[in-house]
Amino acid sequence: MELATDEEFLPVKRVKPQPDWPPSWKESYFYDQGEIYGEISHHGYAYAYDNRWRETLRLLTEVLAPGARILDVAAAQGNFSLALAELGFDVTWNDLRAELADYVRLKHERGKIEFAAGNAFELAFPSLFDAVLITEIIEHVAHPDDFLAKAAALVRPGGYLVMTTPNGGYFKNSLPKFSECADASVFESAQFKPNADGHIFLLHVDEIEPLAKRAGLSVEKIALFTSPLTAGHVKTEPLLKILPRSIVNLAERVSRSLPSALKKRALVQMGVRFRKPN
């Protein structure tokens, strides 16, 4: 399945904020303003989100056709769920915060989407999924090996697990490496916190294969993306405000053509497509 223009994958329906919304809705709308509605306060963040958006959809649509069943774990405001539903996939939205389901429903225009709030690993789904999507989650858990194995258990034989996470090899990362941690349980009290402040481990490329093997998965594709220049990490935010998007996208494409060893140190984000054996 081919990706076309970026706009096709953004939910087009805009909701109007209300003063009586619960706090989680207001927070979700705040992120939607910069991520899908174009009200950008930090251009580097917006470009990084756009890169992750496109890479995530590409990792899925390269191998799955419309009609495939996809579980979006910890889906929050549901933008990936909505986009995939509009592309014709049979999507199940999931999040611990049950009240967010109605916020997602406000933005839903077309496509099949079901809602399953709660701990995805404790819910009784009627069948396994063709793909499970875990975006920006694994860096918030103390035991990424266990998390990956539990997510893999929801995938049918021959199906896929698609993950995005910050690249642990990025030169500005100062967090510990999971594979070098003697006792990850010391981080359990800090897990599940939101945003970058809640990051515990950022996985390195060389950790992906061992984690996949322990989860009974194979690694089909690893994509490194988002230059620190386009993410505004090296004092480029003022430039990003005035540069044409075409120039920013060109800088991003050039960064992805770097030698593999350099990309592991220079690029901010990582996307992985795992496959479960038949």
Named regions from a protein language model:
Residues 5-55, 79, 96-103, 107-108, ...:
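S-adenosyl-L-methionine-dependent methyltransferase catalytic module, highlighting the catalytic core
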Residues 58-65:
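Glycine-rich helix-loop-beta junction characteristic of Rossmann-like nucleotide cofactor-binding loops
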Residues 67-76:
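Conserved class I S-adenosyl-L-methionine
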Residues 77-87:
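Conserved SAM-binding loop of SAM-dependent methyltransferases across substrates and taxa
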Residues 90-95:
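Conserved SAM-binding motif I beta-strand of class I
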Residues 117:
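Conserved residues in the N-terminal Rossmann fold of short-chain dehydrogenase/reductase
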Residues 121-132:
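A short acidic, Gly/Pro-enriched loop at the edge of an enzyme's catalytic core
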Residues 133-142:
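A short SAM/SAH-binding and catalytic strip from SAM-dependent methyltransferases
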